Curated annotation (Swiss-Prot):
Assigned GO CC terms: methylcrotonoyl-CoA carboxylase complex
Domain CoA carboxyltransferase N-terminal positions: 16-272
Function: Component of a biotin-dependent acyl-CoA carboxylase complex. This subunit transfers the CO2 from carboxybiotin to the CoA ester substrate. When associated with the alpha1 subunit AccA1, is involved in branched amino-acid catabolism with methylcrotonyl coenzyme A as the substrate. Shows residual with propionyl-CoA and acetyl-CoA.
EC number: 2.1.3.-
GO terms, biological process: L-leucine catabolic process
Pathway: Amino-acid degradation; L-leucine degradation
Induction: Does not show significant changes in expression throughout M.tuberculosis growth phases.
Protein name in UniProt: Biotin-dependent 3-methylcrotonyl-coenzyme A carboxylase beta1 subunit
Catalytic reaction annotation: 3-methylbut-2-enoyl-CoA + N(6)-carboxybiotinyl-L-lysyl-[protein] = 3-methyl-(2E)-glutaconyl-CoA + N(6)-biotinyl-L-lysyl-[protein]
InterPro entries in the record: AcCoA_carboxyl_beta, ClpP/crotonase-like_dom_sf, COA_CT_C, COA_CT_N, MCCB/AccD1-like
Every CoA carboxyltransferase C-terminal domain range: 275-521
Keywords: Transferase
Provenance organism: Mycobacterium tuberculosis (strain ATCC 25618 / H37Rv)
Electron transport found in the keyword field: no
Name of the coding gene: accD1
Amino acid sequence: MTTPSIAIAPSFADEHRRLVAELNNKLAAAALGGNERARKRHVSRGKLLPRERVDRLLDPGSPFLELAPLAAGGMYGDESPGAGIITGIGRVSGRQCVIVANDATVKGGTYYPMTVKKHLRAQEVALQNMLPCIYLVDSGGAFLPRQDEVFPDREHFGRIFYNQATMSAKGIPQVAAVLGSCTAGGAYVPAMSDEAVIVREQGTIFLGGPPLVKAATGEIVSAEELGGGDLHSRTSGVTDHLADDDEDALRIVRAIADTFGPCEPAQWDVRRSVEPKYPQAELYDVVPPDPRVPYDVHEVVVRIVDGSEFSEFKAKYGKTLVTAFARVHGHPVGIVANNGVLFSESALKGAHFIELCDKRKIPLLFLQNIAGFMVGRDYEAGGIAKHGAKMVTAVACARVPKLTVVIGGSYGAGNYSMCGRAYSPRFLWMWPNARISVMGGEQAASVLATVRGEQLSAAGTPWSPDEEEAFKAPIRAQYEDQGNPYYSTARLWDDGIIDPADTRTVVGLALSLCAHAPLDQVGYGVFRM
């Protein structure tokens, strides 16, 4: 086992603390949900606020790993904080469950495009990790002004119900509590659940609400008469339990969860957790906030892993990629961490290590800070494309759980080789200083300026340095905006932005969630030699 000597670099802590304070402010604002008027109206109807519902549902004192709390940020003005839905994983009656809770204080809980994406992402987490789903329903259905973005396509609203059906078929429990409106297609959430609860004189379920019924048939009927709790619990049979209020409904859901039975045994050996020898808050000191500034990634590893100890694989070979066996909160992990640009040797080492972890049922933790693969004539002649492809293939085919944390830059093909979103990591998080794009803004501006300059030169048109700079400036600005972690997390390119000092805790929680899902057989395609 290896513990490197620790030498803290000049402090970068002030900038990290500023970034974390900005993150916490954004999280607090999103957690409020709708505006004060909407929240007061919600409470005046005898309802608990959405986060109160989640808190009451969870086992007291247990953690809640929230997914994408800043989804939709800035995408629809201020209309949809958190995409109007709360998703995450928490313990209910002793069993880890995925929780999906509509926030009716945000546009009546209606589904914007990012609301659908966030709901589907939560179901994907449930399916990958074999976790029961609990839906706290209070939604007006699809947001009609954007119906073309939420209704017809494969990954739109209907996929929610497809997922419910297929997960139930796999033995993954589906439970719904109707705590408010459940309208139109949304009515299938309780109807397709294994068990459903509804609150008396508060919850309603109908495919067509009173206005639609009147328009279609001329019948005038109240929401309670059309689809209230008494109707569905006594007459239609759509729901199985009638609750008096939110508190009673959540009590019933907890009782249902108590019948789920135990989860599968862990797929790997879990030992006693040992705290690192070095405080996690020191990550603020050892990691430059600017991803372009080099540092030794070993300094990150020793502040995340148990006992600050790890066994490095091929330490003297391909040194721009650190590969190591370690433990986090008692769980084994194979760490793949960038320590510079990727060369052929780094990629071959990474592919070898990933295969080893896959064979040994060791989950993989990718720490991304990657500018990409080395470029140039000699490197192309040396086969860097085929060697990089080996690592990308290994990442794609590995059947063990993969977790990714973007701790700096995530650029170009380096994103692929380090298990970016397209490679289905079980979870992916970003630090507040992270950046993500096809290449850096300066590189993009230079490439496009070169192309433009050649076009002008061929036409015999002069191009002054000032004109070239004026051409480059908006490109840099675009990449700075779109490479920002808040731009990423708004679009669910990740599962959330986390405080660097919380990395060990978040990774440990995720490993505990991944541990009980059966693993597929190892299988790889052709590695081009």
